[in-house]
From Swiss-Prot:
Highest classification ranks of the organism: Bacteria, Bacillati, Actinomycetota, Rubrobacteria, Rubrobacterales
NCBIfam families hit by this protein: PRK04149.1 (NF003166), sopT (TIGR00339)
Family under the similarity heading: Belongs to the sulfate adenylyltransferase family.
SUPFAM superfamilies membership: Nucleotidylyl transferase, PUA domain-like
Native source species: Rubrobacter xylanophilus (strain DSM 9941 / JCM 11954 / NBRC 16129 / PRD-1)
Xref: InterPro entries: ATP-Sase_PUA-like_dom, PUA-like_sf, Rossmann-like_a/b/a_fold, SO4_adenylyltransferase_pro, Sulfurylase_cat_dom, Sulphate_adenylyltransferase
The protein's name in its UniProt record: Sulfate adenylyltransferase
Database matches in Pfam families: ATP-sulfurylase, PUA_2
CDD domains xref list: ATPS
Reaction(s) catalysed (UniProt annotation): sulfate + ATP + H(+) = adenosine 5'-phosphosulfate + diphosphate
Xref: Gene3D superfamilies: HUPs (3.40.50.620), Sulfate adenylyltransferase (3.10.400.10)
PANTHER family for this protein: PTHR43509, SULFATE ADENYLYLTRANSFERASE
């Protein structure tokens, strides 16, 4: 079994991928790419492209071909057997697919028509959306945002290795907090951290999150607070508002020498248990040795059981993922204990427990209501309400 506690963790698959073309070669490659068939990428595919290119999705070197796709959907493994739980695919229409052959090189462009990468087409194949939805999202209900996105995709998937011509350095969100995997790994080494726990969130950090993070921090050297700032649901708190709330919280309530705030610029899939495994693998590539998995991780609505995201890790052999999941129950504020707790540490009945869901708190914030201090630090609430007022104004 891999002892991640005492080693510099190896990237998933053994090598940290870098698919960026050297700067000196980019202009020539762009000019050549201008003559190629072109595929325009939406926000999610652009995000995936960036994650592939910088190594966050190691060992992927491009969008998945048929063998990897089918293996991931059916078995949560790449074709070579390596654990991987979410399909990373590029879809096109049937008409677009007829404009190139397997073996051709195509240009990948953003919404403004700028060529950002090229791809050598290794595979073109059709797929069963409903089958993917059932296995990956556990539902075919198009009210589920991940399923809805899947059913909006083109009819043909295109797989192949990518070469980035634009690594996004001039357009990256929150550049102060943007770190590539190799950069975060260097920071962890510089700080002397051998055991690093990662925490994923798309919500403001509330007292339950703070309790979980600090409980984990008691057992490791450092905490990576790694909020997702890619594509999310329309009713999620905007990333710029959340980021300010994280800054305030870390400045006032966390040890600065044991925490790092860095954005995770991936798109949210809302795939629940499967996405929990996927998020753990991504944090392994960033250099984390441990990853926090809370209640209904990456869930939405009532599609997943409260602790399904814990149980899915049992489907892998101990040490096989190469990162240690830390499972936490739903934390609450106990009026009798006078602090945060879980059912593992609190003897009192539910009448004394104060629970707040992210959905309920978002509603309160948008209505200008102040959630009680049992939910979140007052400074954080001020930032959130102020930010939402400015957005709506």
């Amino acid at each position: 079994m891999m002892r991640t506690e005492y080693t510099t963790i190896t990237p998933h698959g053994g090598t940290l991928v870098d698919r960026r073309v050297p700067v000196g070669e980019r202009e020539e490659r762009r000019q050549r790419a201008a003559e190629l068939p072109r595929i325009v990428l939406g926000p999610r595919n652009l995000s995936d492209l960036e994650m592939i290119g910088t190594g966050v999705f190691s060992p992927l070197t491009g969008f998945m071909g048929r063998e990897d796709y089918e293996s991931v959907v059916e078995e949560m493994r790449l074709a070579d057997g390596l654990p991987w739980s979410i399909p990373i695919t590029l879809s096109v229409s049937e008409e677009e697919a007829r404009s190139f052959e397997e073996g051709d090189e195509v240009a990948l462009a953003n919404g403004e028509g700028e060529i950002v990468a090229t791809m050598v087409v290794e595979d073109r194949y059709t797929y069963d959306r409903a089958h993917e939805a059932k296995l990956v999202y556990r539902t075919t209900d198009t009210d589920h945002p991940g399923v809805a996105a899947l059913f909006r995709q083109g009819d043909v998937l295109v797989g192949g290795e990518v070469s980035l011509l634009d690594d996004g350095t001039t357009t990256r969100p929150f550049p102060r907090y943007y770190y590539e995997p190799r950069e975060l790994r260097a920071i962890f080494r510089q700080k002397g951290w051998r055991r690093v726990v990662g925490f994923q969130t798309r919500n403001p950090v509330h007292r339950a999150h703070e309790y979980i993070q600090k409980s984990a921090l008691e057992t490791v050297d450092g905490l990576l607070l790694n909020p997702l700032v890619g594509e999310t649901k329309s009713d999620d708190i905007p990333a710029h508002v959340r980021m300010r709330s994280y800054e305030v919280l870390l400045e006032r309530y966390y040890p600065r020498d044991r925490t790092v705030l860095a954005v995770f610029p991936a798109a949210m899939r809302y795939a629940g248990p499967r996405e929990a495994v996927f998020h753990a693998i991504c944090r392994k590539n960033y250099g984390c040795t441990h990853f926090i998995v809370g209640r209904d991780h990456a869930g939405v609505g009532n599609y997943y059981g409260t602790y399904d995201a814990h149980r899915i890790f049992d489907e892998f052999e101990p040490g096989e993922l190469g990162i240690t999941p830390l499972f936490f129950e739903h934390a609450f504020f106990c009026l009798n204990c006078g602090g945060m707790a879980t059912t593992k540490t609190c003897p009192h009945d539910k009448d004394s427990h104060v629970f707040f869901s992210g959905t309920r708190v978002r509603e309160m914030l948008r209505n200008g209501e102040y959630p009680p201090p049992e939910f979140s630090r007052p400074e954080v609430i001020e930032v959130l309400i102020s930010g939402l007022r400015q957005q709506e104004g």
